[in-house]
Structures are given as C-alpha cells and as structure tokens.
C-alpha cells in the first residue's frame, strides 16, 4: 500500500478576521501572534480572539499555531509560562518558539515547533531539535532543494516547514542584529526596524560613488508557487506563507492561490494528501501578482541567483501594465498591454529612480485621467498597477466557501428509522430511533434527498453516500421537519 504524506498549507493571520479568511480560503493550519512575545510586536492578539479562531478552525480540522518566538528575558519567564498554559487550555495546537529556555519551563503537553529564528539550516541542528522534543522545524529561507532533501533524509520523521511565499530577510534568520545595533530595536524581540529596506550609497576605496541612494540590501519577495512539487519531493511537509502584518485581501488571495496549486498536485500525486478537511470554492481567480510584492524570486532554492534584489524600491510595484506615451491636458495616454480600471493605483519610477504614483479617477480607452494633479512622466516609462480596484472590490466581499462533504443514509427499520451519516474523511455514525411512518403514495427518494440536504449555515454539504439511493421508496416519515432535527 502506498504510504501517504499529509501536506500542510500554513497561512498567516494578523488578527481574527485574517485567520478566519485563511481557513475559508484553504489553509490547513494558521499561525497567529500571542498576546505577547511574538516576533511581530505589531501583530498581537487577545486570548479571546485566539480561542474564537481555534473553535472555527477546528470545524475543518485546521490547526492553530501561536508564535512565542522572541528571545525572552529572565523576568519574563513566569509570565510566559502562564500564557502558554492559557493557550493550551483554549485548544491551541502548537507553539512556534525561538528561545530554548522555554523547554525548561513547567509546560503543558503542547507541541513545540522550532522557529526559523533558531537558524535551522543543517541536518545536525534539526536532529538536535527533534531529539529535544520539537514536533516540527521551520527551515531557514536561504536553503536549496538539495539542502532541504539532505535534512529530510537525515531526519525523515521530523516534519519540515518551508517558506514558499512572502518577504525575505537579507541576513540569516535569527542572526541579524543590525536593527538592534543601529536603532536599539531588536528583531529577536519583535521590533525589527527594517534596516535592510533603507536606501544606501556604494562608495569604493577611493571615495568614488558607484551607486547612489539605492536599496542595496532589499530583496525581492519569495514565490515558490511553480516549484511546490519539487519542495514536496525534497521532503517539505508544511508550506508556509509569510505575512503576519499583511491585510485580509493578501491572505485571501495568496492562500487561495497556493490551495489551488496544491490541490492540482494532489489530484496527480496520490502519495500526497491535504492535512485538513473540506473543499474550497472561490468567487475569484487567485492572482499572486495582484497582491503586495517587491518582484518575485526563487531565492537560493535552485542555486545562487543574481536576480534576487529589489534595488529601486522596497515597496510594492504590482503588475506591469504598459508604458507612458504622452501627456495631453488633464489626461495621460498609455501603450497598454492590460486594461486599467477606474480607481486603480498606478506607480512608476521617475527620472531620479524614485517611486512615484497616482490614483486613476477615470479611464477612457488608453487615456488615464488622474485624480488630482497630472504627474509628469517621461515617455516610454514603465507603468505598474499596485492597486487593482476591481480585484480588491471582489475580495472585500465574501469570496470563498469551504464545505465538508457528508452523506446521509436513511434506512427503514421495524420500529422507525436508522439515520447514518458519513463525511469525506471516513467518520461515520448511525442513529436509530423510534418514529411514526406511513405508506408513501409516491416514491420518496428525491424528497428524502432534498429534506436531508437542507444543512443550512453549517460547515457541511451533501455528497453521495456509498452507493445508497433512497433509504425507503415506499414509506416516509410522518414529519420531515421532526426528522431533520435528528441531523443535528
């Protein structure tokens, strides 16, 4: 028999709203900041919100991981221990931690995951963490496929969590102290000042300026959507989307994009299966180029790559739309390869290489009427759309539905009926009950399917159940309303 490996799509949540939408759009697990001591000080959440997310996620067997991944001070250990117990009591599935001192605390039986802030880039480090009791290890972003495969071969029983999308650090994770040194804000305390996104000038030994005011340390964003199968074959079990500071539309779009990619792989590769329950249906077509990015890179996954930097700007350019033709009065004409919409955000690099932008008030063919002053743009300047009004309008509404398939079988018994329910994961239950019935005047198959299919606002939808048609074509319950009460 083929051994199947569960594959987890792990999505970020800044808050409860983002967490719920991550679940709705296909996440198998969601990671979210604790009330304190997370590596994103601006993304903390109350115990009440985390508990609400746990309750919702567990309907679909989606796991909730809470980040407690800063270096702790001695005087914070007691408070940390108390908080971990509270997280355990509300049903959190695991903690993502950095400080090994946490393992010395009086902990509840809650799984620990080794944060990427631990600098996990060798088989020896992963083996050490596994031997110390860690259930999952988040690998460093800068590893190649070969390095990931070697770690998996050395530690085959340890689930490996690999980043597949989002921002990249120019330094080794957990080993960067430049923010602390320059600004007194430690990345290992959740207060990174984003030093690597600032502009710098490059001056040689003779004082000659080689490059002036460019973002020399700013990297593009990671995008491994086209090489997911390679990552799975190398041993990755958890595919992680970065973005605990991103907004809800980012979470919706990016999670849905990776869910769609993975489901297509699972349809071909039966040795890989998803790690949660339910089927997602989207009211939009996910597009990674529609969400925040600094341009995309595979980073070092397939070896050293020269095209990993975003020197011009650390901000989101978005999708390239065309080029500037000319300015006439209160509008611009463009040579476009894609259509703009009213309300779109447009950006471009001016003659000094600085990022500029404007909002479109009205579009008329290839004419753009900016809201406010008409910007001066040199002909043939590349134009980008970093805000798609139509796409964002779709994402602002309900944009996905997630349902678990369940089948009903109603069987006739001498004293009533037996109602059997089975879901898509193989969970099955039969309830027998006394119930009045009468001889049906017409076949009841379709009527029974209709009545039992009224599942309302639940996580479930009807699916066929194991070759069973109508449980009774000649008898019927006296009251379908009372019968349906047994469904719940």
Mark where each language-model region is.
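Active-site beta->alpha loop and helix N-cap motifs at the rims of alpha/beta catalytic domains
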Residues: 49-50, 59-105, 111-121
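Conserved small/polar residues in nucleotide/adenosyl-binding loops
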Residues: 481-488
């Amino acid at each position: 028999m083929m051994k199947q490996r569960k594959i987890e799509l792990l999505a970020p949540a800044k808050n409860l709203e983002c967490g719920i939408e991550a679940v709705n759009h296909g996440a198998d697990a969601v990671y979210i900041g604790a009330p304190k001591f997370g590596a994103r000080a601006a993304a903390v959440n109350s115990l009440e919100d985390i508990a609400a997310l746990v309750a919702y996620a567990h309907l679909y067997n989606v796991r909730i991981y809470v980040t407690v991944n800063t270096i702790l001070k001695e005087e914070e250990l007691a408070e940390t221990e108390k908080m971990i117990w509270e997280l355990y009591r509300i049903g959190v599935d695991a903690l993502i931690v950095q400080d090994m001192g946490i393992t010395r605390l009086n902990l509840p039986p809650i799984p620990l995951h080794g944060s990427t802030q631990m600098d996990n880039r060798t088989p020896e480090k992963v083996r050490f963490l596994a031997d110390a009791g860690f259930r999952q290890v988040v690998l460093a972003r800068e590893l190649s496929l070969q390095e990931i495969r070697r770690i998996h071969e050395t530690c085959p029983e340890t689930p490996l969590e690999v980043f597949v999308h989002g921002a990249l650090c120019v330094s080794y994770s957990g080993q960067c102290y430049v923010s602390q040194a320059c600004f007194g804000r430690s990345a290992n305390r959740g207060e990174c000042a984003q030093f690597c996104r600032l502009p710098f000038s490059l001056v040689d030994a003779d004082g000659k300026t080689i490059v002036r005011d460019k973002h020399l340390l700013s990297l593009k964003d990671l995008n491994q959507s086209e090489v997911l199968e390679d990552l799975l074959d190398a041993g990755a079990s958890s595919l992680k989307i970065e973005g605990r500071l991103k907004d809800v539309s980012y979470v919706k779009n990016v999670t849905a994009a990776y869910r769609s990619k993975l489901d297509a792989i699972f349809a071909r590769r039966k040795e890989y299966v998803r790690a949660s329950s339910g089927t997602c249906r989207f009211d939009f077509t996910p597009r990674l180029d529609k969400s925040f990015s600094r341009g995309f890179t595979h980073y070092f996954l397939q070896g050293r790559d020269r095209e990993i930097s975003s020197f011009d700007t650390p901000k989101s350019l978005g999708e390239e739309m065309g080029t500037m033709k000319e300015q006439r009065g209160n509008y611009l004409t463009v040579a476009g390869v894609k259509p703009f919409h009213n309300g779109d955000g447009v950006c471009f690099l001016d003659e000094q290489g600085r990022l500029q932008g404007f909002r479109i008030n009205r579009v008329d063919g290839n004419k753009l009427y900016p809201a406010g002053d008409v910007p001066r743009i040199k002909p043939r300047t590349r134009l980008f759309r970093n805000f798609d009004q139509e796409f964002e309008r779709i994402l602002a509404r309900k944009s996905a539905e997630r349902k678990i398939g369940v089948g009903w079988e109603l069987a006739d018994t001498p004293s009533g009926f037996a109602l059997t329910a089975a879901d898509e994961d193989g969970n099955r239950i039969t309830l027998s009950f006394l119930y009045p019935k009468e001889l049906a005047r017409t076949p009841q198959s379709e009527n029974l399917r209709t009545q039992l299919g009224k599942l309302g606002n639940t996580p479930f939808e009807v699916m066929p159940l194991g070759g069973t048609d109508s449980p009774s074509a000649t008898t019927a319950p006296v009251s379908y309303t009372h019968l349906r009460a047994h469904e719940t």
